[in-house]
């Protein structure tokens, strides 16, 4: 039996919420990634640090990485700008010096003030971004400057919890200018395609925790995806995800990379019988306890219910709400573990919590 990691020659792995939360690795991440023999590329929407700085942070946490293993939204944003502007054009930086350095590396001139007459504005996460930075950017955008956001993640997973992400700052400028930026990072496919282009890869797999960036980005790039439940989105979010945000596989954490892809796939599961009708998805246990435990990593019910809900949604032109119900006590306990028994809840965008 091959593991899902062995089936793919390249893993495009998200960082925040997938590999680590702030300064803490996620469960089993260090050991799991050390055992993966496929090429590992860390693909991050976080534009606050350079590729070398990201690699150094990974090494501090016990991982093995170099700058060549890291693909950042700052790099993607700089490439996007270089394709739109003449060499030497001025770009107002709302973000860190790492972002400014990426802009300079593609032959553009980083500036920080509206008085420098910028041709474009690029915005990435910085913990020190303040009102004055946003004010300079707002003036430039209103004056016609091209506006590029490294990403629009509304939150940033940390060991303290979810903190404001770059998307929260982007929202402030949207409100102030009435304009929308071009987005360089996930879910736009450019970041994924740039990563895959770093080698002759034939079977890449995207691994991440966010439906609205990692998984939607994988789907946009035509790549399979493994959703892990260590960051922003939950099992319930996956069950009710919009089609563009539906993962191919669901696992607990990065230890799932060493499981069989057939176990991880969102599909009907032998341990559960599911009936759909009357606005309800009814789940019953199927088989004896020993057999169920043998094939189940605890998430089989999530994969089974997600498969059933997605199929039901595809067949319902009116997109009516669905209830998830337990047909027996074993199903009830499994559904309650993942908070899936929320009745009469309309299906909406669930990219963030």
Swiss-Prot record:
Cofactor entry: Mg(2+); Co(2+); Mn(2+)
Cofactor binding note: Although Co(2+) and Mn(2+) support eight- and fourfold higher catalytic efficiency than Mg(2+), respectively, Mg(2+) is likely the physiologically relevant catalytic divalent metal ion.
Chemical reaction(s) catalysed: sn-glycerol 1-phosphate + H2O = glycerol + phosphate
UniProt KW Magnesium keyword: yes
Knockout mutant characteristics: Deletion of this gene results in an accumulation of G3P and G3P-containing lipid polar heads.
SUPFAM superfamilies: HAD-like
Keywords in alphabetical order: Glycerol metabolism, Hydrolase, Magnesium, Metal-binding
CC terms in the record's Gene Ontology section: cytoplasm
Biological process (GO), any one: glycerophospholipid catabolic process
Cited InterPro entries: GNAT-like, HAD-like_sf, HAD-SF_hydro_IIA, HAD_sf
Pathway recorded for this protein: Glycerolipid metabolism
Pfam families: GNAT_like, Hydrolase_6, Hydrolase_like
Keyword Magnesium part of the UniProt annotation: yes
Residues annotated as binding Mg(2+): 14, 16, 209
Active site: 14 (nucleophile), 16 (proton donor)
GO molecular function: cobalt ion binding; glycerol-1-phosphatase activity; magnesium ion binding; manganese ion binding; phosphatase activity; protein homodimerization activity
NCBIfam families linked: HAD-SF-IIA
Family membership noted in the UniProt record: Belongs to the HAD-like hydrolase superfamily.
Job description of the protein: Dephosphorylates D-glycerol 3-phosphate (sn-glycerol 1-phosphate). Is the final enzyme involved in the recycling/catabolism of glycerophospholipid polar heads. To a lesser extent, is also able to act on glycerol 2-phosphate and D-ribulose 5-phosphate, but cannot use D-glyceraldehyde 3-phosphate, dihydroxyacetone-phosphate, UMP or GMP as substrates.
UniProt remark on domains: Crystal structures of Rv1692 reveal a unique architecture, a fusion of a predicted haloacid dehalogenase fold with a previously unidentified GCN5-related N-acetyltransferase (GNAT) region. Although not directly involved in acetyl transfer, or regulation of enzymatic activity in vitro, the GNAT region is critical for the solubility of the phosphatase.
Subunit note: Homodimer.
Protein name per Swiss-Prot or TrEMBL: D-glycerol 3-phosphate phosphatase
Native source organism of the sequence: Mycobacterium tuberculosis (strain ATCC 25618 / H37Rv)
């Amino acid at each position: 039996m091959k593991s899902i990691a062995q089936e793919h020659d390249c893993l495009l792995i998200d960082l925040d919420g997938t590999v680590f939360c702030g300064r803490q690795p996620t469960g089993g991440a260090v050991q799991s990634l050390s055992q993966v023999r496929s090429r590992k590329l860390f693909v991050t929407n976080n534009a606050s640090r350079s590729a070398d700085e990201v690699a150094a942070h990974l090494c501090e946490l016990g991982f093995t990485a170099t700058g060549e293993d890291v693909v950042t939204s700052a790099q993607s944003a700089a490439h996007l700008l270089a394709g739109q502007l003449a060499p030497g054009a001025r770009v107002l930086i709302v973000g860190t010096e790492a972002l400014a350095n990426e802009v300079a590396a593609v032959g553009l001139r980083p500036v920080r003030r509206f008085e420098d007459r910028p041709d474009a504005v690029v915005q990435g996460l910085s913990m020190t971004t303040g009102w004055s930075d946003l004010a300079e950017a707002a003036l430039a955008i209103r004056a016609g400057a091209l506006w590029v956001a490294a990403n629009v993640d509304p939150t940033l997973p940390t060991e303290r919890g979810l903190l404001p992400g770059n998307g929260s700052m982007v929202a402030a400028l949207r409100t102030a200018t009435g304009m929308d930026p071009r987005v360089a990072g996930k879910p736009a496919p450019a970041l994924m395609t740039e990563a895959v282009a770093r080698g002759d890869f034939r079977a890449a797999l995207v691994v991440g925790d966010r439906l609205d960036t990692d998984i939607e980005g994988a789907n946009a790039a035509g790549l399979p995806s493994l959703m892990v439940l260590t960051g922003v989105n939950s099992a319930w979010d996956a069950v009710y995800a919009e089609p563009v945000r539906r993962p191919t596989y669901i696992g607990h954490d990065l230890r799932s990379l060493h499981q069989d892809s057939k176990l991880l796939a969102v599909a009907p599961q032998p341990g559960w019988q599911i009936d759909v009708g009357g606005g309800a998805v009814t789940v019953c246990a199927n088989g004896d306890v020993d057999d169920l435990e043998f094939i189940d990593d605890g998430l089989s019910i999530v994969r089974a219910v997600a498969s059933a809900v997605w199929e039901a949604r595809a067949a319902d032109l009116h997109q009516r709400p669905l209830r998830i119900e337990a047909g027996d006590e074993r199903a009830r306990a499994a559904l309650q573990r993942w908070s899936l028994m929320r009745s009469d809840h309309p299906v909406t965008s669930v990219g963030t919590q």
